[in-house]
Amino acid sequence: MDWWLSWTVRDYVDLNKSQRQLLETQLDEFHRWHQQTQLKQYASFVEQLSTELDQPLTEDRLQTLNQDIQQHWLESLDYLMPGIDQLFVSLDSEQWQQLLDNITESQEEYARPFLKNEQQRIKQREKRFTKGTKRWIGKPSAQQQLMIHQWAQQLHPTAQLSLARQAQWNLDATELFDQRHDLDSDTRQRRLRQLLIGDKDNLTAEDQQALSDNRQQTYQLLMDLQRSLTEKQQGKLRQQLINYHADFRFLSSKFDDIALAQ
């Protein structure tokens, strides 16, 4: 995760030497913390998932899994917040505009295929979901592909909403950037955190309902796919989880070995 964060930041904004050093120092500390405290949690999480493969998925279980994943992400974000805050304060106006421009361009590039006609939007949804599915269970059967296609047809379009939210995010983030030297660290970090998490409270009731409907449709698709898995697909899914569990355990044990050697 640390190298991914480093490359992601550098893709969006050109940092000066002191900022690069700050970023690398913060990410080195994050790497040690993440390896020491989080990887064992990930291993336990994946291990628990592997024990549930023979049990039917339920909507409640999917909601819990989603919340668990979100919580893992928030724990990492909270650890990174002081470093994010330092880097945020150090940016000048030119760097800030570059950051906003690149974030907006990335968002528009992602949304562009979904802004075409309905047929193209459905095709893109189906293509992206199928690609992710292949990673976990292999090639979907004809029946499973039909499930994915029907799911893609039923989803509400949200690309325009995403772009509108990005535009509002840019305004809110720029307001905070302009105030960055006038705010105390706690207030600034709290507002930064809220920006990074995303605020859905400002959505209209119609938009909230559309997102909720899409989430329910996706949960239903996942439940239907799980019930339709062949023995070969179940085996691939199980092996994927075993591999992730082994990787997390191995990486966390490397930290334990280093700690014992010191």
Please describe what each predicted stretch is:
Residues 13-21, 73-82, 92, 137-146, ...:
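Short, low-complexity cationic-aromatic patches
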Residues 1-90, 94, 98, 102, ...:
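N-terminal Sec/ER secretory leader and immediately downstream segment
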Residues 6, 166, 170-262:
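A cross-kingdom marker for long, charged
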Residues 27, 150-153, 217:
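Amphipathic, charged-and-aliphatic alpha-helical interface segments
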Residues 85-204:
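Extended amphipathic alpha-helical interaction segments
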Residues 1-12, 82-85, 116-136, 215-223:
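Extended, structured, electrostatic nucleic-acid-contact surfaces
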Residues 21-23, 102, 125, 150, ...:
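Mature extracytoplasmic or organellar-lumen-exposed domains after removal of signal/transit peptides
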Residues 63-65, 69-72, 111-114, 118-121, ...:
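Short, contiguous, well-ordered secondary-structure segments
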